[in-house]
Amino acid sequence: MGGDIFGRELRLISFGESHGPVVGAIVEGAPAGLPLSEEDVQRILDLRRPGQSELVSQRAERDRVEILSGVFNGFTTGAPISMIVRNEDIDSSYYEEISRFPRPGHADYVARLKYSGYNDFRGGGRFSGRLTVSMCMAGAVAMKILEKLGIEVMAYSLEIGGERAEGFTLDDARNYRYMNPVRAPNEESYLRMAAAIERARREGDSLGGIVEAIALNVPPGLGEPIFDTIEGDIAKAMFSIPAVKGVEFGSGFRAARMRGSEHNDPIRVIDGKIRYKKNDHGGAIGGITTGEPIILRVAFKPTPSIAKPQETVDLELLRNVEIKVKGRHDPCVVPRAVVVVESMLAFTIADHIMRSMRGAI
């Protein structure tokens, strides 16, 4: 099973399964001398941990990180940083019962085809949102690199179930997003989004939504044309997050309905520096960062595990059946995905910084 490594100079190796003993991350290429503790990583993990409100999964995981290597006396050594989180609240009996009935919207069927039935299917195995634990652990390391360079990465729930956040500032989002369980940028949108999630939960259904992410103070010149563009690598990082169905930068798909005279961002001298007057390009042109904020939006599908009856098949008897998915699932993955988006955005930018600086920061 491949596809477990992300990055070039800064590399994340993800391992583990949803119902296995651990979920882990190995980060290779991090420079020596970064201050890093288990508390630093734990702070990021706690932002995605389940069971923190009725609006998310009630799986009772502590998600306590253990750093096994690569850190000594509170600083990175330059060696690979290996980290694990132990899976504690596991009940696989239901997944044994339904192994012959692939769940609609999940990777059960395609995984069975690809790996001839040898894959660990419990809780979705390698395809579970549980694997975002490894992304958050790696993101904590990347954020230390960005912090040293004054780069800030933030994300928030822009839209859930058609309820879109409005009337907020960047400071509103920065200060409020982790003060509410929905990760909304202001109180008004939080109340609407929370009510929508609760309605779907009561009805045995689920919702999708959009996470907006911004990276500030990113230097110009990161990225390469054609196959190593900054947007391409960020998009790949986002699509590695389970449930992601779309990514757009700047004006995104709205650009298809604009004229060139509207979309082109004027270049001006502002306070003695060359800047763009607006940012429809979203922080990158030609695959290379411009120095303006990187702005992207990530679309998440509704959680496929729902309590309503769904049509599927019996793989052994080859007949059509109905299934009702049980378990402790998020009625909407968006709130817990916000910090995962931040983590993977931070990791991608840090990787490109390491490329441009040949590993020295």
Swiss-Prot record:
Quick one: which residues bind FMN? Answer: R126, F127, S128, G286, K301, P302, T303, P304, S305, R328
Q: Which domain of life is it from?
A: Archaea
The cofactor(s) it depends on are: FMNH2
Report the co-factor binding details.
Answer: Reduced FMN (FMNH(2)).
Q: Which UniProt keywords apply?
A: Amino-acid biosynthesis, Aromatic amino acid biosynthesis, FAD, Flavoprotein, FMN, Lyase, NADP
Short name of one Pfam family for this protein?
Chorismate_synt
Recorded catalytic reaction(s): these are: 5-O-(1-carboxyvinyl)-3-phosphoshikimate = chorismate + phosphate
Residues the record lists as binding NADP(+)? R48
Question: Where is the chain membrane-spanning?
Answer: none
Q: Which CDD domains match?
A: Chorismate_synthase
Q: Please give the pathway this protein is involved in.
A: Metabolic intermediate biosynthesis; chorismate biosynthesis; chorismate from D-erythrose 4-phosphate and phosphoenolpyruvate: step 7/7
Q: Give the first-level EC class, as a single word.
A: lyase
UniProt KW NADP keyword? yes
InterPro entries recorded: Chorismate_synth, Chorismate_synth_AroC_sf, Chorismate_synthase_CS
GO cellular component term of the entry, any? cytosol
Q: What is its EC number?
A: 4.2.3.5
- GO terms of molecular function: chorismate synthase activity; FMN binding
The biological process GO terms on file are: amino acid biosynthetic process; aromatic amino acid family biosynthetic process; chorismate biosynthetic process
Family designation: Belongs to the chorismate synthase family.
PANTHER family noted in UniProt:
CHORISMATE SYNTHASE
Q: What does this protein do?
A: This reaction introduces a second double bond into the aromatic ring system.
Name of this chain's protein: Chorismate synthase
What organism, scientifically named, is this protein from?
A: Korarchaeum cryptofilum (strain OPF8)
> What gene name is given for the protein in this entry?
aroC
